């Protein structure tokens, strides 16, 4: 029997914290339009995502996917690192 995984939500965001073990905090920005005044508003939401190998670092742009509950706050997991953060050396 094959599982249908096509309906899982995927988000792209920036890693804002990697200080926890196997967990990253990803900030996802969305642009919405106010229903009455039609002004575009930028909103952001933070998700805690599972990072099994501690690959992602602060500032990286990552893709996360919805998954089963892994802890009290974690319902997302890291799929891939889209772009590494630029470091000054």
Curated annotation (Swiss-Prot):
PROSITE patterns linked: RIBOSOMAL_S17
Domain of life according to the entry: Bacteria
Example GO molecular function: structural constituent of ribosome
Pfam hit, one: Ribosomal_S17
SUPFAM superfamilies named among the record's database cross-references: Nucleic acid-binding proteins
BP GO annotations: translation
Cited Gene3D superfamilies: Nucleic acid-binding proteins
GO cellular component terms attached to this protein's record: cytosolic small ribosomal subunit
Quaternary structure, from the entry: Part of the 30S ribosomal subunit.
Family designation: Belongs to the universal ribosomal protein uS17 family.
Function: One of the primary rRNA binding proteins, it binds specifically to the 5'-end of 16S ribosomal RNA.
Descriptive protein name: Small ribosomal subunit protein uS17
Organism expressing this protein natively: Syntrophomonas wolfei subsp. wolfei (strain DSM 2245B / Goettingen)
Gene it is expressed from: rpsQ
């Amino acid at each position: 029997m094959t599982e249908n995984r096509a309906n899982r939500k995927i988000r792209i965001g920036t890693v804002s914290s990697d200080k926890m073990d196997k967990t990253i905090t990803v900030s996802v920005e969305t642009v919405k339009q106010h229903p009455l005044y039609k002004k575009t508003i930028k909103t952001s939401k933070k998700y805690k995502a599972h990072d099994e190998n501690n690959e992602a670092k602060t500032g990286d742009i990552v893709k996360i996917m919805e998954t089963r509950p892994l802890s009290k706050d974690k319902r997302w997991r890291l799929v891939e690192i889209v772009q590494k953060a630029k470091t000054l050396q």
